[in-house]
Curated annotation (Swiss-Prot):
One Gene Ontology molecular-function label: toxin activity
UniProt lineage: Eukaryota, Metazoa, Spiralia, Lophotrochozoa, Mollusca
Protein source organism: Conus lividus (Livid cone)
Coiled-coil annotated spans: none
Compartment list: Secreted
Protein's UniProt name: Conotoxin LiC33
């Protein structure tokens, strides 16, 4: 009888069938993967600019012609 409550709790914690999104997608909805890709690209550009400007000011977009 001790196993019954544990079994019921495990059943409640187990993943259920995938839910269906109740809201229809609109043109304003952006997939999360796309958002993460954009954020990753932006961070990579900023990182490259930071490395470039740190040692070589001539390649920095603020001080020179580089991007």
């Amino acid at each position: 009888m001790r196993c019954v409550p544990v079994f019921i709790i495990l059943l409640l914690l187990s993943p259920s069938a995938p839910s269906v999104d109740a809201h229809p997608k609109t043109k304003d909805d952006v997939p999360l993967a796309s958002f993460h890709d954009d954020a990753k690209r932006t961070l990579q550009r900023l990182w490259i600019k930071a490395l470039c400007c740190y040692g070589y000011r001539f390649c920095c977009p603020i001080f020179g012609k580089g991007k």
